Structure formats: C-alpha cells, structure tokens
C-alpha cells in the first residue's frame, strides 16, 4: 500500500472514509471500504445482539458469528443489516483431520491454489459460506504444508480476527 499519507474513499459521489492506508485496511468503515483496499472475506447478515464492543451477527446462511466492531461501526444495532470482514491472512488452513484451535472452524476443499511469490492464496469451497480466501506466507507454505487442488481442509479464525461493520 504505497500510497498517500491520507486517502479519501468515495462511493456514489460521497466521501465515506478518510484515513491513512493502514487505517483503511485495518479498520474499514463499511463493507465497501473493506472491499476497496485489499481482499476480504465478507459475511453478510443481521445483527442479533450487541455485546459491548462486539456484535453477534446471524449470517445469511443461518450461522452466528461474533466479532468486534470496527472503530467506525458504532452505528450498528440489533436487527440491522451488517457484515463481518475477515482478511485472508488472518485465516488458518490445515488438513481436514488436523486439530485446529480456532473459534470459527469450517470444512472444505481446495478449489484453487495461487502462488503469489511471497505468499500462496487458497480458495477453499465451504458448505457454510461458499468460497473462503486464505493467504499463507511463503515460509509456511512448502512441501508437506502445501495443499493441492481438491484437498480436504479445515479453515478457521478467531472472533477477534473479524470486524463487524455496516453494509
């Protein structure tokens, strides 16, 4: 993200967030901003309950996810449409039979493996959410740690790795 010191993101002719590149990536104000800079796994749903600075969201698939509010997400309230964004580099991947100690765990199959030089991106087809994108640093993705197309895997993340925000 070699950009300006401050960036304004516009949508439909209005500025929706002005921040540093790091703030835009780490604390997007909305789903649009989360998708604007970098890639995110975006899970839409309805806010079921607010718990302090966290949100319990019932996804469109009927699952409940808990995540902290993005610093600009204070406008969310119960029964409002919302979204939880999880960046690909914050999601773990392991063989399907591995003991993964993450708060959210999904089973799936590797649909695509993309070598990016400094990392490898896996696109994992899950029954719960469709395709989930996972990015693994190069030093962790070699030999026995690499997963080929069709491999049965588990993907997972902790609640703190997501950010709840307005659509």
Which functions belong to the PLM regions below?
Residues 1-63:
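Internal alpha/beta loop-helix hairpins
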Residues 40, 49-167:
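Non-catalytic connector elements of ABC transporters
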């Amino acid at each position: 993200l070699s950009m300006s010191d401050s960036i304004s993101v516009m949508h439909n002719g209005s500025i929706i967030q002005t921040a540093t590149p790091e703030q835009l990536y780490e604390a997007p104000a909305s789903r649009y901003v989360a998708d604007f800079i970098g890639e995110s796994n975006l899970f839409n749903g309805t806010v079921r309950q607010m718990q302090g600075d966290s949100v319990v969201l019932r996804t469109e698939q009927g699952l409940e996810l808990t995540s902290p509010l993005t610093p600009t997400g204070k406008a969310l309230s119960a029964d409002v449409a919302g979204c939880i964004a999880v960046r690909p580099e914050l999601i773990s991947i392991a063989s399907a039979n591995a003991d993964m100690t993450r708060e959210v765990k999904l089973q799936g199959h590797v649909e695509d493996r993309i070598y990016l030089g400094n990392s490898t991106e896996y696109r994992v087809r899950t029954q719960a959410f469709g395709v989930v994108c996972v990015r693994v640093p190069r030093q962790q993705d070699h030999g026995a740690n690499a997963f080929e197309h069709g491999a049965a895997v588990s993907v997972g993340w902790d609640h703190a790795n997501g950010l709840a925000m307005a659509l």
